[in-house]
Regions:
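Conserved glycine-rich cofactor-binding loop
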Residues: 12-13
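Conserved NAD(P)H cofactor-binding loop of Rossmann-fold oxidoreductase domains
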Residues: 84-89
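Substrate-binding pocket helix/loop in short-chain dehydrogenase/reductase
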Residues: 92-93, 100-105
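Active-site loop immediately N-terminal to the catalytic Tyr-X3-Lys motif
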Residues: 94, 143-147
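Active-site helix of classical SDR
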Residues: 116, 152
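Residue(s) in the substrate-gating loop at a strand-loop-helix junction
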Residues: 136
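SDR active-site lid
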Residues: 165, 169-230
Length: 257
């Protein structure tokens, strides 16, 4: 039996790196491909986990099909696609600018959609496979300064949930992950963009290793979604959107710009 091919974007990041460890621990025979733009961090992750590394700019959407074909020619079809790459800025919509905004949309929404579209035909043909999309709680509730990021994560989250419905009878599972703040470079960068205060200082923040373990557990069980830290599951249960908006307006940190 051919070992599974697992592809993880953002594989050099905090969450992606922990996910690599989970998959390597439980599937020592797997062919793991890590994708990231940070070549130095990617090389470290590759060597640590015995993986294959691919440096790729996911914002170059038109180049993705050619890169994908080259990858599967060299490494074989992808059995598990983990869309974990992401960037975040907390800046008002008027302060973001289109170029920065487009980059947020491309990395957080367009690229994972394109990669799903490229990966799914062979999964459907084999009636076997899994896609894991890392969305965000910022795509579930309005957070000041996150028009582009929250919009992109809302898009990939909903698209992922719909894809699960589309594919559940075709042997392909789709998991949607909704993290709140997680200790990572992304979280540190975002925190640096907001005014200091009780909200930014004490907002519940999770551990990447715990999130990765929960994602893997959901993968093994064929589950649908992960919400972590647990307190953010409450936001999913709030039925009154007006109440949610008022609460988020009060609790959202204030962007510097």
């Amino acid at each position: 039996m051919t070992p599974p091919h697992i592809l993880i974007t953002g594989g050099a990041g905090a969450i992606g790196g922990q996910l690599v460890g989970q998959f390597r621990q439980h599937h020592p025979e797997a062919r793991i491909t890590l994708v990231d733009l940070n070549a130095e961090a990617l090389a470290l992750a590759r060597d640590q986990h015995g993986a294959h590394a691919e440096t790729c700019d996911l914002t170059d959407i038109d180049a993705l099909p050619g890169w994908w074909q080259s990858l599967i020619d060299r490494r074989g079809p992808v059995d598990v696609l983990v869309n974990c790459a992401g960037i975040m800025d907390i800046i008002s919509i008027t302060g973001t600018g289109w170029e920065r905004g487009k980059r947020l949309l491309d990395i957080n929404f367009t690229a994972p959609m394109r990669l799903m579209e490229l990966a799914l035909p062979t999964m459907v043909e084999a009636r076997n496979g899994c896609v894991i999309n890392v969305a965000s709680m910022a795509g579930r509730v309005p957070i000041r300064g996150c028009s582009y990021y929250g919009g992109a994560k809302a898009g990939i989250g909903l698209a992922s949930e719909i894809a699960r419905l589309d594919l559940k009878k075709q042997g392909v599972n789709v998991i949607t992950v909704y993290p709140g703040p997680i200790h990572s470079g992304l979280e540190s960068h975002a925190r640096s963009q907001v005014k200091k205060g009780p909200v930014s200082r004490y907002i519940p923040t999770g551990k990447p290793e715990v999130l990765a373990e929960r994602i893997y557990r959901t993968f093994r069980k064929g589950g649908a979604r992960v919400i972590y830290p647990d307190i953010y599951a409450l936001a999913k249960q709030v039925a009154n959107l007006n109440l949610t908006n008022r609460a988020m307006d009060f609790f959202s940190p204030q962007p510097n710009q």
